[in-house]
Amino acid sequence: MLLVIDAGNTNIVFAVHDEKGWRGTWRIATNHQRTSDEYAVWLLTLLTHARLTPADVHAAVIGTVVPAALYHLRRLCRDWFEVEPLVARASLDWGFDIQVDHPEEVGADRLLNAMAAHQTYGGPLVVIDFGTATTFDVVDKRGAYCGGVIAPGINLSLEALHQAAARLPRIGIGRPQSVIGKGTVAAMQSGIYWGYIGMIEGMTARIESEFGAKLKVVATGGLAPLFSEGTQVISRIDPDLTLEGLRLLALRNPTPFLNRDRARMVDGD
């Protein structure tokens, strides 16, 4: 069984996968102060609830955009699961070209999304990830990563409005019925929702124009379903895209086992 860890700026997602598919997925808020032992107490409780044990895990892979979390996540894998985790980075075997000026600067999550989207849906395509940042990543027909766009995330934009403007409240995200708001909250919701819909549509059109081809548009991230309701541009929603990318990367880059008595990998892990 493969332990998959996707560490983002807001949340860390843990998942396990075997020949039958995804056996469990769990999410915890990102906290730079949390230790490997604290992760272990939390995760082992959830594994027990799923009728799994650390001995069921034979490999691990970590994707992170939070360097401060990596040390403790590695220790978690080594100390509690006795496996040496693969850490996603540009220098690994991805199975495709990374056609940007500085590949090492590209966030692992963006490459993982590109890998999984092309494997699942074929190219050419663009992946829109509604995360802490809103990213657009372009993949050509052969699967090569062509670069993309990074914009402020939706929650980040909302928080910036609240922090920078004394009279603007902190609000939740929802789809307003009309563009023209009749109150402050409605106006803010419209600005965020329809403003981002406009960016999605406008940016996709500009990317397609520059790329010279019609692209499939795959969306991921927690807010993907909400924003897909407001546009016809998004053709697929895949909430597990980054996890699937980590699984595929682990298949291409097997790692040594710390405990040779458990040195086996279930077919399909």
UniProtKB/Swiss-Prot annotation:
Cellular location(s): Cytoplasm
KW Heme (keyword) present: no
A biological-process GO annotation: coenzyme A biosynthetic process
Active-site feature positions: D109 (proton acceptor)
Alphabetically ordered keywords of this record: ATP-binding, Coenzyme A biosynthesis, Cytoplasm, Kinase, Metal-binding, Nucleotide-binding, Potassium, Transferase
Positions bound to K(+): D129
Involved pathway(s): Cofactor biosynthesis; coenzyme A biosynthesis; CoA from (R)-pantothenate: step 1/5
GO cellular component, one term: cytoplasm
InterPro entries cross-referenced by the UniProt entry: ATPase_NBD (IPR043129), Type_III_PanK (IPR004619)
SUPFAM superfamilies hit by this protein: Actin-like ATPase domain
Cofactor: NH4(+); K(+)
EC number: 2.7.1.33
Highest taxon listed in the record's lineage: Bacteria
UniProt GO MF annotations: ATP binding; metal ion binding; pantothenate kinase activity
Keyword Cell cycle: no
Pfam families linked: Pan_kinase
UniProt subunit comment: Homodimer.
Chain's role: Catalyzes the phosphorylation of pantothenate (Pan), the first step in CoA biosynthesis.
Family: Belongs to the type III pantothenate kinase family.
Protein name, entry field: Type III pantothenate kinase
Species per Swiss-Prot/TrEMBL record: Granulibacter bethesdensis (strain ATCC BAA-1260 / CGDNIH1)
